[in-house]
Each structure stands twice: as structure tokens, then as C-alpha cells.
């Protein structure tokens, strides 16, 4: 992204389920100084279009399962972001609508990218939106300090050891996965992904990966 001029303060939007690429975005986009905007895949196109416009997205990364939704959302937004298609081999597939694929974008990257920590810990790291049940969605900004504090708090509250095995049943787009992308990575843990949580998938992950931690809404 830096090779394409994306930098500090630019909003990079994401429409994707729980997949490894979403985690990579949660780590890489803030390292760029840009702002991660992970979006709820269950929202309608008009609402997503409002978010893309209001959040001033310059880049949109989209899992091809949601390509039709993303195309319509962009048409509602009045913006012309760089669209990057994520093709998950375990997903149902879908049409490419972007200028390039996610893997193609990675191939453009500079292996010697010079990471520079934020000059101000209050710089924006992520931009989330409320569900908009009483009107238009409202933007909520996470700072680097806020995300770090929440990530550390997860460790303290759960008394988490090093090397946990975390099952992603909570959407990464929900409050940035409650900051567990950074918590688990900080602890040198293992991330186990489920595109769509189900009883079979959850219990199967328990058996296959010896899961130690997970989060979820009451329905999970």
C-alpha cells in the first residue's frame, strides 16, 4: 500500500469475514500509519456506501464472496477507492471487481519497508461504525494507545499465558475483534479462523487445534 501512496491518516476499508487476510490487515494497516476500517459484512449496500463515503476510504479490500455487495456499496458512496480482491481458497468464491488481487498487492510490497512507530500515541489506528439502528452509523476512532491498552487489558483480565490458541468466532469487524488481533499476536499465540461459525466448525477446531480461548456473542 505504501508503494501506491497510502500513508498516515488514509482510511483503508475492509469487507471480509474472519480470514487470515483480515488479521494481516489489522496488523499491517496501522503499521503504515493508515486507519483500518473493518466493516460488518451483514450491513446493506446503502449503509456500507455511507460508511465508505463518511470514512473517506481510499482503498477497499473485499473478499470475493461479498463482491456484489461491495460493488453496490461503492456505487452508493460517491468515492472511487482502489479495490483489492481477496480470494480465499476456503471461501465460496465470487467475481473479481478490483484492480488487483490481494496476493498481487503483496507482491508489489517492499520487503525492507521501514516501520516507524506513531509519533503520537493518540493517532488514529482504526475507524469503526455503530450499527446505525437509530439513524446513520456513527464513526468511532480507536487510537494506538487505546488499542494497546485494550489488548493488554485482555491479557490481564483473562490471565492469559504465552502461546494461547485463539479461535476466531467473534467477527474481526466487531470492535476490531475486541482487540484480540493484537492481544494474541503480542502473546505469540495461534489464530484459528472460521469464515462462518457453526457448532461443527467450533467443535472441530477444538479437537484439531486444542483451542484454549475464544470470544463470542451469546448465540455462539
Where in the sequence are the language-model features?
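Gly/Thr-rich phosphate-binding loop signature of adenosyl cofactor/nucleotide-binding cores
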Residues: 12-14
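Conserved AMP-binding/adenylation subdomain of ANL enzymes
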Residues: 148-165, 173-213, 219
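Structural core segment of the AMP-binding/adenylate-forming
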Residues: 3-4, 24-27, 31-104
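Conserved G/P- and acidic residue-centered "switch" motifs that form tight phosphate/ATP-binding loops
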Residues: 33, 133, 188
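Adenylate-forming
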Residues: 17, 62-71, 170, 197-198, ...
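Conserved AMP-binding A3 loop
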Residues: 125-149
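Conserved coil-to-alpha-helix start sites within the AMP-binding
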Residues: 16-27, 42-46, 169-187, 197
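Conserved pre-ATP/AMP-binding loop-to-beta segment of ANL
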Residues: 98-99, 108-129, 136, 159-165
